[in-house]
């Protein structure tokens, strides 16, 4: 399942990211798929339905046994009760730090958390990534969810208060333009230019770059 800060954002992630990956799978990796090759709402990895014809019934023709994954990838509109009553193997929560009123990420997580469980058994996982809005525009709820996900603070069942584990990745670890050809971040300004993935020189470190940005904003 896919959720984002708005329905159109979830749809865009599905159509622009998920579907092209499926389309470009090598044929020997691609599961059997039902429906269109570029769907707008759901990727259905199941065996397409076949019609029962009079000829098949009269001749008692045996249907070819083909197995599929019997699973789907879809997206939902943003709302507190999105995916209510469903069971999921994976939920991708995109831009979860930017849910503005009247939607509330805390309310939605109380619902979707149950989609990943059967009683006490965990049957699915959630990947919830985001930068954060201002506190009064969804950031406060996301902040609470983040601090409720401290892996060092667990209840008697071994789970955090939220059921998630928090992971903070600082901006400088993955800032475009400051990653060298080996995939490592260039923190400090190098003595001689490093080389980026595209062969372009990196003459400045990301920390110095952002220090200059901050200084430029001072009145």
Regions found by a protein language model. Give the residues of each.
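Extracytoplasmic/secreted cell-surface and envelope-processing proteins
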Residues: 12, 100-101
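Walker B catalytic acidic pair
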Residues: 94-98
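Conserved RecA-like helicase motor-core motifs
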Residues: 26-36
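Conserved P-loop NTPase catalytic core
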Residues: 36-41, 49-54, 59-64, 68-81, ...
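Amphipathic alpha-helical
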Residues: 16-28, 219
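Conserved Walker A/P-loop ATP-binding site and its immediately adjacent core
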Residues: 1-21
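Short, conserved "post-DEAD/DEAH" coupling segment immediately C-terminal to helicase motif II
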Residues: 102-122
């Amino acid at each position: 399942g896919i959720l984002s800060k708005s329905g159109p954002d979830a749809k865009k992630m599905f159509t622009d990211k998920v579907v092209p990956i499926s389309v470009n799978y090598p044929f020997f990796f691609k599961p059997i798929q039902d429906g269109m090759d570029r769907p707008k709402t759901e990727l259905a990895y199941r065996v397409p339905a076949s019609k029962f014809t009079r000829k098949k019934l009269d001749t008692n023709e045996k249907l070819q046994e083909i197995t599929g994954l019997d699973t789907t990838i879809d997206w939902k509109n943003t709302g507190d009760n999105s995916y209510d009553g469903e069971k999921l193997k994976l939920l991708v929560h995109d831009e979860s730090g930017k849910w503005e009123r009247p939607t509330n990420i805390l309310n939605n997580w109380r619902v979707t958390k149950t989609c990943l469980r059967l009683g006490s058994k965990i049957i699915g996982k959630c990947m919830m990534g985001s930068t954060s809005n201002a506190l009064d525009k969804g950031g406060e709820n996301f902040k609470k969810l983040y601090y409720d996900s401290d892996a060092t603070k667990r209840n008697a069942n071994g789970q955090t208060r939220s059921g998630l584990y928090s992971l903070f990745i600082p901006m400088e670890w993955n800032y475009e333009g400051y990653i060298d050809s080996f995939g490592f971040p260039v923190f400090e300004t190098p003595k001689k230019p490093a080389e980026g993935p595209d062969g372009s020189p990196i003459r400045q470190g990301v920390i110095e770059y952002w220090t200059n940005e901050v200084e430029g904003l001072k009145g």
